[in-house]
């Protein structure tokens, strides 16, 4: 029998850094949906409970994307947008804003807390296999991810790990945790589970649009969540060892996703001008291993995690993202969110390095091409615009199509995102050359041996040697393969910048700062061909390279992940690493409509974003940074 318990409506009273939960619950709610038994002993109860948690995630799916994208610099709001969305873009969200509802996060958290406290993790089947550990670990990862989203948006939050089931429970006082506290707690909570359970997931077969084992997409891989927790913690503290832990977590996910010592390469997908063509009307999209639009699960698919959306609005958790980003009949073809001038400027500022049909010479695409074909081509491939005509009235109207948000389900994690975060973590860990390789050529053991190890200290070489991308399984595509739009079976690795900006290894405008090369010389003092002398990187050069790569990474996040709901969080994370975090973030956001219009944008937003307190939401005066 299912017992309906309480609804989180969090109204906080803060005393000395603690929050009372006496008004957290409404007894007429259906927010906690577990059995009234002390433990979840059977598969029916356990699976129903996990599905219930996934259902609660649906309520925060849209706002996860919107809060992460609308407050950034790569999208703008149209006149069609509702006032709540407009207030979000202007950092002016009131208590009644539909996207400012912390109770929905705590509904997920409280259900997770109940499950974790009551599931029978010791129960085994007749094959001596644990029955419910997969669910236990999956729910712990969901709880950690949800708390991370909550604190990223509110800055300081009441922290509850026991299920709240009664008024007496609600009247207890709970500590307030900031971002650093949340990260440290859940790193400690999840890390012990990874040796055995990091790659074990519940398997619930086909769920609505998710077929062929794609129910695995509903879960949050523990090593990715740990990577994110460590990356945020390192960005706040500047601790190099924490960056290294983040890098190892992302690497472990990549190297173990399909089994121990398996392969999950970045893939050889890219959008380019047809090699050898100079007419600038002939583009080519080469997709190897699937892209962000494929909601299937396989060894080489791009998508990693989704929050499922209902198929019809009447079901209650229907994602509105497609109506906000994509012209369709359901929104009368009027969208609320479009690419910003900042997005156009970022894309057009890239030098697109084209190659000849033989791959032996290179040249650059013109910088003045129209319809967003200048610079990086990823924007052109995911965005289209124009005008439609009302067949009844003859009225003309603008249409806009951002393909990345045209789906029923809400995309959270994908492969390219994890490689970009691996690069970010490696850069912070003191390996800017390795990070740059992920952007430029792709990273495998050959690159590590030739470009990284010779320039590292012995201890650094020992550490990074844990990253193992064998050439036989992570082969880098050649320029000839790029020119021919083909790749051999094991040539599955490419620099991420090449996905939209041409053949990056040839790009003269995309080079890592370095010292002048040294060569051995003959008796007459002439350099001997092929006798390059590797020089150890100095701390000064490494720091200069780190700062340079950090700026490239933030740009690449924008080029690759635009419109996917990560931009504001990315700017925030990169800002924490700057000497003046507030000024860094403010400059980025105020340039949403171009740097020349930053002053006007600053006046429209009104909030002083150089003050970190204004980065975060508040609710009812009781949650958020004070």
For each predicted feature, which ranges?
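Bacterial Sec-dependent N-terminal signal peptides
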Residues: 1-31
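Long, intrinsically disordered, low-complexity segments
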Residues: 20-21, 210-214, 297, 302-321, ...
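Membrane-proximal, proline-rich intrinsically disordered regions
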Residues: 21-70, 593-626
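Short, surface-exposed recognition loops and adjoining beta-strand edges that mediate ligand/DNA contacts
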Residues: 36, 64-77, 199-220, 224, ...
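Conserved, well-structured interaction surfaces
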Residues: 47-48, 82-154, 173-184, 188-202, ...
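Short coil/turn linking the two alpha-helices of tandem helical-hairpin repeats
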Residues: 151-158, 232-239, 430
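Flexible, polar/acidic helix-loop-strand segments at domain edges
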Residues: 343-415, 461
């Amino acid at each position: 029998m299912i017992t309906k318990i309480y609804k989180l409506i969090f109204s906080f009273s803060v005393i000395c850094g603690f929050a009372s939960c006496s008004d957290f619950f409404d007894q007429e709610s259906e927010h906690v949906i577990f059995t009234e038994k002390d433990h979840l002993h059977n598969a029916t109860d356990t699976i129903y409970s996990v599905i219930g948690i996934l259902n609660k995630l649906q309520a925060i799916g849209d706002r996860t994307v919107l809060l992460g994208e609308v407050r950034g610099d790569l999208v703008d709001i149209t006149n069609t947008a509702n006032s709540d969305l407009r207030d979000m873009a202007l950092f002016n969200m009131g208590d009644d804003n539909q996207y400012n509802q912390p109770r929905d996060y705590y509904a997920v958290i409280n259900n997770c807390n109940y499950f974790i406290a009551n599931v029978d993790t010791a129960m085994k089947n007749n094959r001596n296999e644990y029955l419910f550990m997969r669910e236990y670990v999956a729910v712990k990862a969901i709880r950690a991810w949800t708390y991370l989203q909550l604190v990223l948006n509110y800055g300081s939050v009441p922290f509850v790990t026991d299920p709240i089931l009664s008024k007496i429970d609600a009247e207890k006082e709970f500590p307030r945790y900031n971002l650093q506290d949340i990260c440290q707690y859940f790193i400690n909570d999840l890390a012990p589970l990874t040796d055995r359970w990091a790659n074990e997931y519940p398997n619930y077969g086909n769920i609505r649009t998710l077929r062929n084992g794609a129910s695995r997409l509903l879960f949050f891989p523990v090593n990715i969540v740990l990577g994110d927790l460590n990356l945020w913690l390192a960005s706040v503290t500047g601790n190099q060892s924490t960056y290294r832990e983040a890098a190892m977590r992302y690497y472990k996910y990549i190297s173990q996703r399909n089994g121990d010592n398996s392969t999950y390469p970045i893939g050889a997908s890219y959008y380019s001008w047809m090699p050898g063509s100079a007419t600038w009307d002939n583009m080519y999209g080469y997709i190897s291993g699937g892209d962000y639009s494929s909601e299937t699960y396989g060894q080489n698919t791009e998508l990693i995690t989704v929050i499922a959306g209902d198929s019809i609005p009447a079901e209650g958790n229907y994602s509105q993202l497609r109506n906000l980003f994509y012209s369709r009949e359901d929104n009368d073809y009027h969208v609320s969110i479009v690419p910003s001038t900042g997005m156009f400027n970022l894309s057009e500022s890239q030098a697109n390095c084209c190659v000849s049909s033989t791959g032996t010479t290179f040249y650059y695409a013109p910088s003045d091409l129209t319809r967003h074909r200048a610079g990086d081509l990823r924007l052109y491939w995911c965005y289209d615009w124009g005008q439609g005509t009302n067949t009844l009235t003859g009225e003309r109207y603008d249409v806009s199509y951002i393909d990345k948000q045209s789906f029923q389900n809400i995309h959270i994690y994908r492969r390219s995102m994890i490689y970009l975060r691996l690069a970010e973590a490696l850069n912070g860990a003191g390996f800017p050359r390795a990070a740059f390789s992920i952007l430029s050529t792709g990273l495998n053991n050959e690159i590590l041996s030739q470009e990284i190890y010779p320039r590292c200290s012995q201890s650094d070489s020992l550490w990074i040697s844990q990253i193992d991308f064998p050439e036989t399984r992570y082969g880098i595509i050649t320029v000839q393969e790029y020119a021919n739009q083909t790749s051999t079976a094991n040539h599955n690795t490419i620099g991420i910048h090449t996905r939209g900006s041409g053949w990056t290894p040839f790009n003269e405008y995309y080079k890592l700062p370095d010292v002048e090369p040294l060569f051995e010389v003959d008796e007459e003092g002439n350099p001997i061909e092929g006798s390059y002398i590797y020089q150890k990187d100095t701390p000064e050069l490494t720091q200069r390279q780190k700062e340079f790569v950090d700026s490239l990474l933030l740009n690449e996040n924008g080029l690759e992940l635009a419109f996917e709901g990560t931009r504001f969080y990315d700017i925030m994370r990169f800002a924490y690493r700057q000497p003046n975090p507030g000024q860094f973030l403010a400059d980025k956001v105020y340039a949403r409509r171009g740097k020349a219009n930053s002053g006007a944008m600053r006046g429209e937003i009104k909030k002083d974003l150089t003050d970190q307190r204004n980065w975060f939401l508040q609710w009812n005066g009781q949650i958020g940074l004070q």
